[in-house]
Structure formats: structure tokens, C-alpha cells
Amino acid sequence: MLGGMSMLAQDISPVNSVSYEWKSVPIVGGGFVDGIVFHPEAPGIRYCRTDMGGAYRWDAASCQWTPLLDWISLDESNLQGVESIAIDPQNPQNVYIACGTYTSSSNGAILCSYDGGRTFARVDVPFTMGGNENGRGNGERMMVDPQNGNIIYMGTRLHGLWRSMDKGQSWARVVSFPDVSEKFNPADRAAWGNRGSGIVCIVYDVQGTQDGRGTRDIYVAASLMGRENLFVSHDYGESWRPVGGQPVQYRPTHMVLTGD
């Protein structure tokens, strides 16, 4: 037995030493990327949003994504969930980020940048957001008017449609917009998982509007099924009505305006 063990020991060759090079692993981001926003006119300007890992701007020179919200403290980590991003079609330097991870947490904030995302002014808003809730991969809930960069619309999950007339510095609810809240069985558990997604995307129709007031015709879609979920305004957002003949058996997720 001992002899066998001695032979086995003699058959094992020493392992050659290997030189390893150690370096830090670059962790440049986190969260699930649920939306990418491109500027319609300026090539290379794009942003992406994540459910709970902040927002990022594409850096064409270095071919990488630059984090924009790493300055947010742990105490305010609810703002790391990004609900929507909007870029001003007339001025690519103006970008707006709607922040709030859960509707069960504190109210969200709109971060306004007028220098391409290098600095931000924080505007606290009186409604919650749900960047990490159901429907996070829907279209953009916040959109800048392509004919008047002062005007921004923001569709919320639980609190209707809101509008800013001063580049995001203040917000007021559009009280004429219909109630699109989703009704659930009161016996269901009260958790974010069974709360509605609310308004999910906004589209402007710029055809025929050249008076400087902004875009006259605006479409807003809500994540509803079995009832009207697509609405239009033909008077600059003052009044709203359901679009006729719309299918109600599906939930809308994104919208694109066609030529007809």
C-alpha cells in the first residue's frame, strides 16, 4: 500500500508556474435596457434608458455608452429607474429624463439638460413613475413638441396626462384628457404588479401646423384592453376624443405616424 502510494507520488509532475495579469473589470452600467431614443435630425445623438440602472448617452468618439445618473445618491435610488427620455427635435442639446422606479415609492422627478446631458436641473413632480414596473418596454411616455420646444407632454401610469410649457421647469395636469386608469378587482393584492401601465406613448402629427403655437394634432395611447385606448387632440391639447374605429382587443405599446 505504501509502495503504491510512493509510486503514485513519483508519477506526478510538478505544474509549471503561469504568469497572470490582473486588472479591474469595468462595470459601466446596470439594469435592463428598455428603450433607446434617437434624435430625428442629428446623427449619432442617442440615449438609452434602463429600468433601475439610470440613463446613458452614446459617445461616438469612444464608441461606448456614458452613464448620466451616477451622481444620484443611494438615498434617492428611486430616481435610477428611468420611465422615459425625450429629446428636443429642434435642439439636440435639450434632453429630458423622467425618473422614478416604482409607483409605490415617492414622487418622481424630471431631469432637464440644456447642454446635451452634461448637467441636469432637477424638477420634482407631483406624480409617481414606474421605470421598473409592467410595461417598461413600451414607447416613450414623454415627448417634446417638434414645432415648439417649450412644450413637453408626459403620460403617467396612475395620474393622467401632464404638460410643461416652459421646457420642463413646471408641469400641470391636462384635466381634459380622459380617465385611462385601469380597474382591478379590489380583492387583488395591492402591489405594483397589478397596477395599470397608464399612458404608454405619444405622437405628434406636424402636417398642416405652421403657426408657431406648436403641434395641433396629438395622439396619445394608453395600455388598456377592452375599451378605447387611443385618443387624439385637434386643438393643441385642449380637448381630447377617442379615435374612431380603433381595435380594442389589444393593448397598444408603440406608435408610428404614417403618411396617410
Which residues fall in each region the model found?
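Bacterial N-terminal signal peptides
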Residues: 1-4
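Extracellular glycan-interacting surfaces
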Residues: 7-260
